């Protein structure tokens, strides 16, 4: 499943790997997780067409003994695919990465915290070390939060706080991208504040 979206995006949203629904559709972030993302897009005042979506690993890592069961990609799978993800980000040249889940966090940054620790931190961290593996001249901003699939699982357990924090992280990521556009590209505010 290749990345899709706006090649001039200021925000690239990175997940770990596609799931069963994405594999069938050939599109990143569809199904229930995609529906939640659409709600987040609406809440921050953007659409799928405003961003670029990709996964660190383009193939659906599956357990062959259990149909439709997903697992995290192995180090070997990440190593085989990550250069394509890095190159895609270099070409798009966004100012902000929004990292969804632990695979995206660990692959795109040098941050050693777990995604759950970041998600529970009420301060909405900005991860400034987004340049891991990338050839970029300008420091970038990276924000990390739980993947929509994890949020749906937490929501089912009545943990609305994780969803609220994720939405605040999304808002902050788009605010930073908008501010960057205003300062360096002379544009007017684009994203919801």
Describe every region a protein language model picked out.
Residues 1-193:
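A polyanion-binding, active-site-adjacent surface
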């Amino acid at each position: 499943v290749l990345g899709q979206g706006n090649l001039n995006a200021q925000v690239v949203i990175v997940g770990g790997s596609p799931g069963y629904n994405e594999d069938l559709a050939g599109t990143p972030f569809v199904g229930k997780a995609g529906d939640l993302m659409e709600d987040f897009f609406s809440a921050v005042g953007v659409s799928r067409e405003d961003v670029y979506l990709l996964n660190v690993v383009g193939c659906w890592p599956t357990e062959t003994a259990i149909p439709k069961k997903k697992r995290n990609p192995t180090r070997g799978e990440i190593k085989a695919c990550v250069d394509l993800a890095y190159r895609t980000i270099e070409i798009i040249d966004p100012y902000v990465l929004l990292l969804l889940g632990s695979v995206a966090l660990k692959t795109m940054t040098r941050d050693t915290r777990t995604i759950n620790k970041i998600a529970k931190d009420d301060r909405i961290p900005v991860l400034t070390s987004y340049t891991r593996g990338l050839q970029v001249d300008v420091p970038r901003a990276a924000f990390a939060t739980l993947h929509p699939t994890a949020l749906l699982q937490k929501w089912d357990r009545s943990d609305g706080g994780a969803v609220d924090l994720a939405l605040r992280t999304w808002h902050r990521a788009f605010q930073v991208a908008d501010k960057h556009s205003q300062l360096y590209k002379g544009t007017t505010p684009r994203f919801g504040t």
